[in-house]
């Protein structure tokens, strides 16, 4: 079997001075040699068959095998998200509304009324502010959690610490929601303490669980396999990652659907039960973690590449200046090969660089992913509304003894139904017909339909204003029934369309965060995606003073318009990435672009993916 060296040395070589006598078909002969190389199968270091260039573009791609530990991690995510969302879904009513008149003193409402469950009675502005503070912290702490796992503790230990903190938070929330505490007016302090601790635990957990899941797939690069029916296919880690991410996000929303139990608990029994049920489900977490501990593929902390990451950017800034930042090839100035070609081997002042050319490519991909995540805050505002505005909107509609926050759960239910359709129906069908519905197209589509969700919210709010007994001051109305003659089920399209958008945006973002990050920064880059939610919460926090009647239509209209314009800009800015055949951190070449011989050999021998193989498993 010919190697790269064989292919090159077997081609005719002509000295510079004899080029005039070279045969006319020189280019054709060299092209023929490389073409022959392209079509020769090769084995990787594990003896697995790698595809030729022709096979890479013609064979159908499928998922590789998925270990059972990956499914157990998805189950762990279910338990954590169920306990998290089970609490979060009732935060709004707990803070905004007072204890209902004629209720049981635990926050539940009398039967047969249109009253809303409540406890503290602080109003929409305070409720939204505290909810956004919680969300901001829960999605800011992951930045620290990702760094801690990458550099100090590893993913598993960091997750275990987060789970312990999570348990303390659940206990504080339950104690603060006891009827005796609420009736004495002392519920605010334990609630605030509880959500702060809950945000810390969730942040440590969330930034590391999806990278740990994707760590369980140990296949690196493309592999050719013959199926029992004789069809030759490519086992593609990108497809495997997509399937894992879909399963993971599906379990996130199965857990979120647990909010259905807590919303009915607050309505019928009280908040002590609404917070107590998530705590019971939380108890599954330490048991499941103990069960899979010795079976997991664990990557030890190897020190974050964050320092090198910034030194690469700093070197490029010094050599290229700020004006050209972001242009194609900007970071190439930091490549050791470029520095050597220009007669220098130092970063600056003769100090040798401690990275290679491949790491600079990793930095490029990571920066692209992080800039993509900057578009997500506006999308998140469209997916569920600003603050607690949509839950508050439901309180001004006819509920007929249903909780006003029940429809939150239909977002999760929609995701649960949509993910299998995409995973086992739509995406395989597209791949079978060689239709590449790339990550940028998926995210753009999600952005657009989320904007539609906000537009529907604006129409619903307008109808409430037009039909409410209090007109354009419908929130907290006490005239007549106090609600507009509109069923709360008018909100259903908002939640369902938002759920569909998440299947395209959030799932794809998880894939990008993991696949485009350097090996020692995967937790940190994943946390950058999560931090987009924190930025969204900060934007929403700035908007909370405007969440008052008669202006509640505009918090839906503005994100819808911005989201539509942003989606168009986003697609034209990043559409080239749909042709980028990234495979788990960059192994692969641009689709349709013939890679260099050196790059092909690097891929086939595994050189380009050595950084992804840890020195040990612990």
What do these predicted ranges mean?
Residues 225-227:
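Membrane-interface alpha-helices at helix entry/exit sites of multi-pass transporters
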């Amino acid at each position: 079997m010919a190697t790269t060296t064989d292919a090159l040395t077997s081609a005719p070589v002509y000295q510079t001075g004899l080029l005039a006598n070279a045969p006319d078909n020189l280019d054709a002969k060299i092209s023929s040699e490389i073409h022959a190389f392209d079509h020769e199968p090769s084995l990787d270091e594990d003896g697995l068959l790698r595809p030729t260039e022709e096979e890479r573009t013609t064979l159908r791609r499928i998922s590789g095998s998925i270990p059972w530990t990956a499914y157990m991690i998805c189950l762990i995510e279910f338990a954590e998200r169920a306990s998290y969302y089970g609490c979060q879904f009732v935060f709004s009513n707990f803070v905004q509304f007072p204890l209902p008149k004629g209720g049981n003193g635990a926050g539940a409402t009398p039967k047969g009324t249109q009253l809303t469950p409540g406890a503290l009675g602080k109003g929409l502005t305070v409720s939204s502010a505290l909810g956004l503070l919680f969300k901001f912290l829960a999605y800011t702490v992951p930045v620290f959690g990702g760094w801690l796992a990458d550099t100090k503790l590893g993913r598993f230990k960091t997750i275990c610490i987060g789970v312990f903190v999570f348990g303390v938070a659940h206990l504080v929330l339950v104690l603060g929601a006891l009827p005796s505490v609420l009736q004495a007016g002392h519920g605010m302090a334990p609630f605030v303490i509880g959500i702060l601790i809950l945000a810390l635990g969730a942040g440590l957990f969330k930034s590391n669980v999806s990278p740990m899941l994707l760590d369980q797939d140990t296949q690196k690069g493309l592999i050719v396999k013959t199926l029992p029916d004789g069809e030759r296919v490519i086992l593609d880690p990108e497809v495997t990652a997509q399937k894992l991410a879909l399963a993971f996000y599906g379990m996130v929303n199965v857990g979120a659907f647990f909010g259905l139990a807590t919303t009915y608990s607050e309505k019928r029994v009280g908040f002590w039960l609404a917070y107590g049920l998530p705590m019971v489900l939380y108890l599954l977490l330490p048991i499941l973690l103990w069960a899979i501990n010795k079976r997991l593929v664990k990557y030890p902390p190897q020190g974050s590449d964050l320092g090198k990451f910034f030194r690469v950017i700093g070197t490029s800034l010094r050599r290229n200046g700020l004006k050209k930042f972001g242009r194609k090839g900007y970071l190439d100035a930091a490549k050791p090969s470029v520095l050597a070609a220009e007669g220098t081997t130092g970063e600056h002042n003769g100090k040798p660089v401690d990275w290679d050319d491949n790491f600079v490519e990793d930095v490029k991909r990571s920066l692209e992913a992080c800039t993509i995540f900057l578009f997500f805050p506006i999308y998140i505002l469209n997916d569920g509304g600003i603050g607690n505005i949509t839950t508050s909107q439901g309180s001004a509609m006819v509920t007929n003894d249903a909780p006003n926050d029940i429809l939150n759960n239909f977002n999760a239910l929609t995701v649960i139904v949509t993910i299998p359709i995409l995973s086992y129906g739509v995406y395989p069908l597209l791949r079978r017909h060689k239709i590449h519905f790339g990550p940028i197209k998926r995210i753009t589509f999600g952005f657009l339909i989320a904007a539609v969700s906000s537009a529907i919210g604006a129409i619903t709010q307008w109808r409430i204003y037009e039909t409410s007994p209090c007109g354009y001051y419908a929130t907290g109305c006490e005239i007549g029934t106090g609600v507009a003659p509109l069923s709360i089920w008018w909100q259903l399209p908002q939640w369902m369309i938002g759920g569909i958008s998440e299947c395209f945006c959030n799932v794809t973002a998880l894939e990008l965060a993991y696949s485009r990050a350097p090996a020692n920064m995967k937790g940190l880059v994943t946390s950058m995606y999560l931090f987009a939610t924190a930025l969204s919460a900060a934007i929403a926090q700035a908007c909370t003073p405007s969440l008052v009647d008669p202006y509640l239509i505009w918090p839906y209209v503005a994100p819808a318009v911005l989201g539509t314009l942003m989606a168009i800009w986003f697609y034209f800015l990043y559409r080239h990435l749909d042709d980028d055949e990234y495979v788990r951190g960059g192994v692969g070449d641009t689709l349709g672009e013939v890679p260099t011989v050196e790059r092909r050999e690097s891929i086939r021998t595994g050189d380009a993916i050595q950084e992804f193989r840890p020195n040990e498993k612990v």
